Curated annotation (Swiss-Prot):
It is an enzyme of class 7 (translocase). Residues 22-224 form the Cytochrome b561 domain. PANTHER family: OS05G0565100 PROTEIN (PTHR15422), TRANSMEMBRANE REDUCTASE CYB561D1-RELATED (PTHR15422:SF9). Its EC number is 7.2.1.3. Pfam families: Cytochrom_B561 (PF03188). It comes from Homo sapiens (Human). It is found in: Membrane. Keywords: Electron transport, Heme, Iron, Membrane, Metal-binding, Translocase, Transmembrane, Transmembrane helix, Transport. Heme b 2 binds at residues 93, 166. Probable transmembrane reductase that may use ascorbate as an electron donor and transfer electrons across membranes to reduce monodehydro-L-ascorbate radical and iron cations Fe(3+) in another cellular compartment. Binds 2 heme b groups non-covalently. Its cofactor is heme b. GO terms for molecular function: metal ion binding; transmembrane ascorbate ferrireductase activity; transmembrane monodehydroascorbate reductase activity. This is Probable transmembrane reductase CYB561D1.
Length: 229
């Protein structure tokens, strides 16, 4: 079994130019949506007005922006750092995921402090339960990535298989994060501020980057890795 590389997969040779440009445009839009939605949630939260106000801010930074961009780094058409080497992209991926974990930890700390101070019970909604599972899965993914970064120190014998698991589970974790964000939009806090057609638009925004990322991983990496295992 040959060592597996994580790199950019070129587009098919006979692919129409229009299709190629449409795919690139969808990637640019995914970056804009990830950034714009994070800014929107930050403005909506009015950080500093309460302990709770920091929770959506840091969680949006963690999952809607940092994690999304860390995954898109490896996209053949959508990466903002397409000019970087594979080694540099891996380092940037680690930096993005580390920042995501730090922001998620801060977001968790603020919501626990807020509910404790208000004497409210924890884990009473689907949003909180799925969010807790997402945080746990994110931590497991980080450990898996650490093993891939230092396979000899971690005594990993089947690196190719672990990379496949890391890719597949990484997609699942990001989709779990997207579901958590969607469930948060059903909260009293969010629905008190966003109503009508605007609410449905907000519901669609986090789904779009998730679809782009799902297509990226399933099309460009998973079939290739299964063949090389």
């Amino acid at each position: 079994m040959q060592p597996l590389e994580v790199g950019l997969v070129p587009a098919p040779a006979g692919e129409p130019r229009l299709t190629r440009w449409l795919r690139r445009g969808s990637g640019i839009l995914a970056h804009l949506v990830a950034l714009g939605f994070t800014i929107f949630l930050t403005a909506l939260s009015r950080p500093g007005t309460s302990l709770f106000s920091w929770h959506p801010v840091f969680m949006a930074l963690a999952f809607c922006l940092c994690m999304a961009e860390a995954i898109l780094l490896f996209s053949p058409e959508h990466s903002l750092f397409f000019f970087c080497s594979r080694k540099a992209r891996i380092r940037l991926h680690w930096a993005g995921q580390t920042l995501a974990i730090l922001c998620a930890a801060l977001g968790l700390g603020f919501i626990i402090s807020s509910r404790t101070r208000s004497e409210l019970p924890h884990l009473v909604s689907w949003h909180s339960w799925v969010g807790a599972l997402t945080l746990l899965a994110t931590a497991v993914q980080a450990l898996c990535g650490l093993c891939l970064l230092c396979p000899r120190a971690a005594r990993v014998s089947r690196v190719a298989r672990l990379k496949l698991y890391h890719l597949t589970c990484g997609l699942v974790v990001y989709l779990m994060a997207t579901v958590t964000v969607l469930l948060g939009m059903y909260s009293v806090w969010f629905q008190a501020q966003i109503k009508g057609a605007a609410w449905y638009l907000c519901l669609a925004l986090p789904v779009y980057p998730a679809l782009v990322i799902m297509h990226q991983i399933s099309r460009s990496y998973l079939p290739r890795k299964k063949m090389e295992m």
